[in-house]
């Protein structure tokens, strides 16, 4: 049959293959005319001739009236008279054109924003590059203790007069001393008491002294109403001891108040727990508060527990107290070292090098700006890893005491970045009752340290029971904290720690997509958060307005690009005729979110487009094969795909023509892009993937039509293909900016199999009951029950869930272990498995996205700017 070719100008048939020496090659989508080739795309209402780089489109008259398959769009459908498609309607897409256009008109990224982004990146790189032993704010409390030290030359002057001058110059307007930008009564009371004692000792600053006493007298009577949630570390030890000292100095302060009596009782109870054996042989947190233990401590014995740097747990106050009792030169050298750094004051804790580096890395990662600082992050983590200890780490490289907060943060981040670290380090912080605490042998724990252990526990590998124990313990603790309205922290005062805990519990790692976490943390991050030792302190390299500003600008810039891509994909879907199909789900935006929530960077634009198009086609063909198409139609469609033959279109009903042309055109276009990217032809490779996919769909259709329930193993073998994850990924990886990618992953890859299997099991767990109501008899749960007729449905469900959890742990191991698979490919595979967990969190989130929380996630990630 002669094929007419349409003139690009007149739209009139100008020749035929016979008269123009033209050849049409169906499997390549090419027309060759007089020796020149053009690729064509066919769709229900147009032919697009591709010449050179640009597509040139010319409308045809209705194709059923032409000689190009003259009956291809006729009303005949060839459906067997005894086949009736199921009467199942899917919800329409929430994301229609009006909604998309109205939302995406909300903001545009300006040129000034892009310049500001570059400026902020440069400034934050400077933060990384200037990290030393830790940037932290002044501690009036510790500075007052250092200012007490008399000159070592015997003169009646302070050894560090600049610290005394700092106290005189830094009294706050209300007469107190302490953290200026955050009022915490405990902090102000303790710092003020320390300062007025120091001024009394040196008989100076009468004005400041009287103002300080006045503040103290007014504030201490209000302390009965203060909650214990943010009482500074060691307050009950040092505060009563300092009151005794103030009394001996003749300071006119109230000493008989209920609050003071309560603190005295707490101190006595704590001192009773201290044994001589522990005090002088084991480094514990008591070393942090030695200034409050002078009446019971033999300071000559305590010296042997001194840290390498000469301090006692990095506390200037504790170290100053020991020096005044012993004259130890290493104590003095430490204080001189700190003052060389800070000049006229000292911080609450120093150094804080490990703490600062880990929290800065965690901050930029959670805010989604880490891609701008890859080298800086590696340098910071190399430093931390060089200090890693199998017993755990503390806040500084030479800290003699490990804490679970820094250890858990370090374990999680180092493992995620490929460092070899063992979770056995957590055993240090587990007591005989199976509970986890911040310090070995202590009973203290707070929300942030338990939250960090919980986050850490989720990067577990198979067989790591300590991680499972940590997860159960911390999850229980955090849920109780929320239920009891006790989501306050012992170690930090954060903008929205409750929000952080709620997010972590609702969206654990395998369900939390990167952009979803970023959007949440932008709202929870506090650029003015403060930490709590013996006094409040700020860490400007951790809590910083610049991080938040960059996070918002960067998020909105990327989001603007994503919106442009969505509009293009919606147009593609419409021009392909897919919106006219009534039997399937229109889920362009949802499938785009599935990839953009992970591979969000501008350089992965083609990757996102391909992922979305393949996903849309999978949804359509899944619905076609899953009951709407008759057995003969399915067989015909599969044969057309196998032969890649457009001539079979004339035997198809209209809806199948749309499906086949959409698949045909998209695969050819993707293959051409893949050839450019990979440097070799990939059309055969992509077609083969689709043949495998449709074979799996066909097998499921045969099971459904025959009411056949396979064995569990037989089901799993097919189901991990039919879920479509492998088809999506094995095509999309061609566009992850990696060379020779196909040498690293294929259908036999364990990593890919686990991603497919966990996605399938998650889907079955949440949808099998609804599918059964629609006549489906095959799911992992039903197949497992067939193999074991004696078990209940609940037991089968429990088994399938346990299998999925174990496979997720295996997936962790495959993702994080060191091998030759490129990181971008790993990330795409792993996050596709994660997004499957997210979509099935409440049920079938793809089908019913308009009524589930997934809709809100899409809004926040793709349409609502961060403000």
UniProtKB/Swiss-Prot annotation:
Mg(2+) 1 binds at residues 622, 626. Pathway: Terpene metabolism; oleoresin biosynthesis. Its main location: plastid. Signal peptide: none annotated. Changing residue 622 to A: Loss of activity. Keywords: Chloroplast, Lyase, Magnesium, Metal-binding, Multifunctional enzyme, Plastid, Transit peptide. GO terms for cellular component: chloroplast. Its EC number is 4.2.1.133, 4.2.3.140. It comes from the Eukaryota. A motif (DXDD motif) lies at residues 403-406. Mg(2+) 2 binds at residues 622, 626. Substrate binds at residues 270, 490. One of its GO terms (molecular function) is terpene synthase activity. A motif (DDXXD motif) lies at residues 622-626. Its cofactor is Mg(2+). It is an enzyme of class 4 (lyase). GO terms for biological process: diterpenoid biosynthetic process. It catalyses: 8-hydroxycopalyl diphosphate = cis-abienol + diphosphate; (2E,6E,10E)-geranylgeranyl diphosphate + H2O = 8-hydroxycopalyl diphosphate. Gene3D superfamilies: 1.50.10.160, Farnesyl Diphosphate Synthase, Terpene synthase, N-terminal domain. InterPro entries: Isoprenoid_synthase_dom_sf, Terpene_cyclase-like_1_C, Terpene_cyclase_plant_C1, Terpene_synth_N, Terpene_synth_N_sf, Terpene_synthase-like, Terpene_synthase_metal-bd, Terpenoid_cyclase/PrenylTrfase. It is found in: Plastid, Chloroplast. The Asp-Xaa-Asp-Asp (DXDD) motif is important for the catalytic activity in the class II active site relevant for the cyclization of GGPP. The Asp-Asp-Xaa-Xaa-Asp/Glu (DDXXD/E) motif is important for the catalytic activity in the class I active site, presumably through binding to Mg(2+). Belongs to the terpene synthase family. Tpsd subfamily. PANTHER family: (E,E)-GERANYLLINALOOL SYNTHASE (PTHR31739:SF25), ENT-COPALYL DIPHOSPHATE SYNTHASE, CHLOROPLASTIC (PTHR31739). This is Bifunctional cis-abienol synthase, chloroplastic.
């Amino acid at each position: 049959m002669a094929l007419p070719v349409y003139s690009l100008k007149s739209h009139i048939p100008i020749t035929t293959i016979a008269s123009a020496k033209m050849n049409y090659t169906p499997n390549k989508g090419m027309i060759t005319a007089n020796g020149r080739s053009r690729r064509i795309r066919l769709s229900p209402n147009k032919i697009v001739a591709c010449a050179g780089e640009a597509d040139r489109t010319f409308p045809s008259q209705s194709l059923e009236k032409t000689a190009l398959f003259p009956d291809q769009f006729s009303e005949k459908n060839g459906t067997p008279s005894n086949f009736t498609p199921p009467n199942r309607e899917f919800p329409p897409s929430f994301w229609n054109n009006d909604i998309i256009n109205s939302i995406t008109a909300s903001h545009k990224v300006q040129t000034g924003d892009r310049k500001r982004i570059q400026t902020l990146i440069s400034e934050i790189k400077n933060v990384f590059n200037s990290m030393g032993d830790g940037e932290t704010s002044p501690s009036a409390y510790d500075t007052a203790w250092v200012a007490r030290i008399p000159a070592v030359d015997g003169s009646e002057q302070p050894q560090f007069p600049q610290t005394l001058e700092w106290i005189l110059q830094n009294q706050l307007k209300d007469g107190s001393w302490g953290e200026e930008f955050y009022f915490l009564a405990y902090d102000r009371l303790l710092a003020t008491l320390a300062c007025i004692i120091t001024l009394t000792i040196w008989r100076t600053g009468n004005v400041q002294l009287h103002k300080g006493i006045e503040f103290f007298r007014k504030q201490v009577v209000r302390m009965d109403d203060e909650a214990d949630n943010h009482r500074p570390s060691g307050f009950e030890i040092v505060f009563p001891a300092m009151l005794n000292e103030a009394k001996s100095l003749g300071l006119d302060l109230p000493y008989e108040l209920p609050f003071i009596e309560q603190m005295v009782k707490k101190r006595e109870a704590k001192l009773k727990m201290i044994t001589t054996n522990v005090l002088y042989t084991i480094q514990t947190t008591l070393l942090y508060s030695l200034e409050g233990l002078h009446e019971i401590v033999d300071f000559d014995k305590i010296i042997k527990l001194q840290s390498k740097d000469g301090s006692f747990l990095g506390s200037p106050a504790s170290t100053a107290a020991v020096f005044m009792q012993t004259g130890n030169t290493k104590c003095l050298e430490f204080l001189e070292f700190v003052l060389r750094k800070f000049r006229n004051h000292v911080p609450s804790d120093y150094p804080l090098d490990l703490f600062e580096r880990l929290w800065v890395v965690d901050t930029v990662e959670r805010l989604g700006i880490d891609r701008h600082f890859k080298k800086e992050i590696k340098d910071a983590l190399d430093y931390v890893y060089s200090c890693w200890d199998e017993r755990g780490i503390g806040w500084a490289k030479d800290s003699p005491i490990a804490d679970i907060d820094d250890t858990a943060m370090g374990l999680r981040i180092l493992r995620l970045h490929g460092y070899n670290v063992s979770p056995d380090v957590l055993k240090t912080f587990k007591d005989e009752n199976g509970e986890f605490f911040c310090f070995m042998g202590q009973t203290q724990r707070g929300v942030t340290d338990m939250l960090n252990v919980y986050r850490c526990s989720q990067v577990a590998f198979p067989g790591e029971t300590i991680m499972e124990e940590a997860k159960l313990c911390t999850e229980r603790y955090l849920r109780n904290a929320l239920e009891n309205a006790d989501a306050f922290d012992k170690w930090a005062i954060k903008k929205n720690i409750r929000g952080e805990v709620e997010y972590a519990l609702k969206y654990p790692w395998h369900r939390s997509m990167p952009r979803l976490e970023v959007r949440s943390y932008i709202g929870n991050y506090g650029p003015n958060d403060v930490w709590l030792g013996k006094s409040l302190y700020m860490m400007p390299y951790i809590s910083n307005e610049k991080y938040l500003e960059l996070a918002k600008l960067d998020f909105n810039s990327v989001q603007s690009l994503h919106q442009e891509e969505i509009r293009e994909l919606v147009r593609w879907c419409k021009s392909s005729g897919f919106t006219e199909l009534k039997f399937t789900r229109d889920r362009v935006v949802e499938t785009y979110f599935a990839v953009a929530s992970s591979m969000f960077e501008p350089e992965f634009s083609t990757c996102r487009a391909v992922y979305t198009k393949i996903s849309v086609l999978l949804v359509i063909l899944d619905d076609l094969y899953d009951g709407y198409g008759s057995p003969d139609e399915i067989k015909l469609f599969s044969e057309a795909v196998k032969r890649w033959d457009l001539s079979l279109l004339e035997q198809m009903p209209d809806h199948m023509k749309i499906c086949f042309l959409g698949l045909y055109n998209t695969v050819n276009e993707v293959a051409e892009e893949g050839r450019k990217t990979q440097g070799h032809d990939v059309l055969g490779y992509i077609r083969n993937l689709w043949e495998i996919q449709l074979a799996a769909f066909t097998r499921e259709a045969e099971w459904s039509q025959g009411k056949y329930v396979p064995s569990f193993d037989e089901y799993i073998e097919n189901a991990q293909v039919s879920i479509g994850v492998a088809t999506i990924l094995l095509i999309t990886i061609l566009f992850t900016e990696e060379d020779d990618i196909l040498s690293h992953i294929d259908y036999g890859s364990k990593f890919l199999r686990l991603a497919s299997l966990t996605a399938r099991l998650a889907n079955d767990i949440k949808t099998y009951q609804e599918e059964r109501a629609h006549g489906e008899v095959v799911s992992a749960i039903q197949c497992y029950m067939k193999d074991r007729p004696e078990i209940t449905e609940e037991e089968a469900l429990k088994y399938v869930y346990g299998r999925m959890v174990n496979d997720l742990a295996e997936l962790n191991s495959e993702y994080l272990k060191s091998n030759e698979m490129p990181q971008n490919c790993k990330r795409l595979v792993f996050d596709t498995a994660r997004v499957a967990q997210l979509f099935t969190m409440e049920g079938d989130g793809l089908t019913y996205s308009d009524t589930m929380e997934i809709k809100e996630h899409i809004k926040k990630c793709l349409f609502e700017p961060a403000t």
